[in-house]
């Protein structure tokens, strides 16, 4: 059985914690899309591990971890992250790690281009992480990108890299500060170190599914950052939902969605339930809302059920993991976005609009809930939660039509209620 963990909001929902719990039984843990722009922390046995490109199943010594074909793969980040995990005691990580030979290579060139493209946008910048994810996927779509298996054909690899660099140099001129020969030299070293990790991921996943082992797939980013279904253009450059998993790994999974009990977003783009006042600052402080990858503070606001329902309609979730319920413990009153209203007609929308200009003009309809103002961190059973917290969770289920199966009440692996 293959299980996917997907984010339903704008990322940072707390997917890593559920991944850590479920990967204890998994024998394969895989990433399907994205790159080292994603980031989450896993706390296990009192140690905090940071993951960006590598699957977090590496915490389990019995689990093989695969970076799939839909990922844009940065070799330097791969070895740096692996070394950091080994320094923290994961001595088994190296032998439990595989990379698809079909994955696209993310280059230093892409990162430099990413920065220049953001500069071109000036006041309309996307707010990328600057890791070159967009340019990598752009090269993939243009069919002039470099795949992992091509690293090992030195002549072909170097010729393709020089052509890419020349093309960008024509576009940006002296603004592009990049030495192609330095990058080529780095890959001569990688060419010696990388072969033991590279596999045909299609055959590997086919064999794993046929064997009947538990497979866990970690979704990166989240549905509202999806290139097709997110708040375009303020999105990432890959399919972050179910479609990206299917193409990135070729699996037939069940789908677990992870959502915070409130809402956050990093970078630019529309965020209808954002609170820029006292409540938003309080959520940011209590929830420790700053990014693992960039350190940027996350924008915070109330739970937006319009977003969650839309996300569920795209990804066909089978269950929710509602995270960070404990962050709401001290709020006397909670607000939940339940509809968007057309400012001219006053009618509530029955859909999440693609037109961001129109969405920006829409008003948010909130429902207020009484807060519980009591700690939930030590609670292990749903029936032991305060009545108001139970009502909050049940309303999420009722509104979205998807059952809540896990509730996060703290950062630790054991801070989870199972329903």
Swiss-Prot record:
Stored Pfam families: Adenylsucc_synt (PF00709)
Catalysed reactions listed for this entry: IMP + L-aspartate + GTP = N(6)-(1,2-dicarboxyethyl)-AMP + GDP + phosphate + 2 H(+)
Subcellular localization, as worded in the UniProt entry: Cytoplasm
Nucleotide-binding found in the keyword field: yes
GO BP term, example: cellular response to cadmium ion
HAMAP family with a match to the protein in the record: Adenylosucc_synth
Protein name: Adenylosuccinate synthetase
Protein source organism: Chaetomium globosum (strain ATCC 6205 / CBS 148.51 / DSM 1962 / NBRC 6347 / NRRL 1970)
């Amino acid at each position: 059985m293959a299980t996917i963990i997907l984010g339903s909001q704008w990322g940072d929902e707390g997917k890593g914690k559920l991944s850590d719990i479920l990967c204890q039984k998994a024998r394969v843990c895989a990433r399907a899309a994205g790159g080292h722009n994603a980031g989450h922390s896993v706390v296990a046995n009192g140690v905090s591990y940071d993951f960006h490109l590598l699957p977090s199943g590496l915490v389990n010594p019995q689990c093989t971890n695969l970076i799939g074909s839909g990922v844009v793969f940065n070799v330097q980040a791969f070895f740096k992250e692996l070394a950091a995990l080994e320094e923290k005691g994961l001595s088994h990580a190296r032998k439990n790690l595989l990379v698809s030979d079909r994955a696209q290579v993310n280059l230093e060139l892409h990162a430099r281009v990413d920065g220049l493209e953001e500069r071109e946008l000036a006041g309309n910048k996307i707010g990328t992480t600057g890791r070159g994810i967009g340019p990598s996927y752009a090269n993939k779509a243009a069919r002039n990108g470099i795949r992992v298996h091509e690293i090992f054909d030195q002549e072909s690899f170097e010729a393709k890299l020089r052509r890419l660099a020349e093309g960008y140099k024509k576009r940006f001129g002296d603004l592009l500060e990049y030495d192609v020969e330095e990058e080529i030299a780095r890959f001569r070293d990688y060419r010696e170190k990388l072969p033991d990790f590279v596999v045909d991921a299609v055959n590997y996943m086919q064999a794993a599914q046929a064997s009947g082992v538990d497979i866990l797939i970690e979704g990166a980013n989240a549905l509202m950052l999806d290139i097709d279904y997110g708040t375009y253009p303020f999105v990432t450059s890959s399919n972050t939902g179910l479609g990206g998993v299917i193409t990135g790994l070729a699996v037939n999974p069940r789908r677990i969605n992870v959502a915070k009990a409130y809402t956050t977003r990093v970078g630019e783009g529309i965020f209808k339930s954002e609170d820029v006042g006292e409540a938003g600052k309080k959520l940011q402080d209590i929830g420790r809302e700053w990014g693992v990858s960039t350190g940027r503070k996350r924008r915070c606001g109330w739970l937006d059920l319009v977003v969650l329902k839309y996300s569920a309609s795209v990804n066909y979730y089978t269950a929710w993991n509602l995270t960070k319920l404990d962050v709401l413990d001290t709020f006397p009153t909670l607000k939940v976005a339940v509809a968007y209203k057309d400012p001219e007609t006053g009618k509530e929308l029955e859909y999440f609009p693609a037109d961001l200009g129109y969405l920006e003009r829409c008003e948010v309809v909130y429902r207020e809930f009484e807060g519980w103002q009591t700690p939930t961190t030590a609670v292990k059973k749903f029936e032991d939660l305060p009545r108001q917290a139970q009502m909050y969770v049940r309303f999420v289920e009722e509104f979205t039509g998807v059952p809540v199966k896990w509730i996060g009440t703290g950062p630790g692996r054991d801070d989870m209620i199972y329903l």
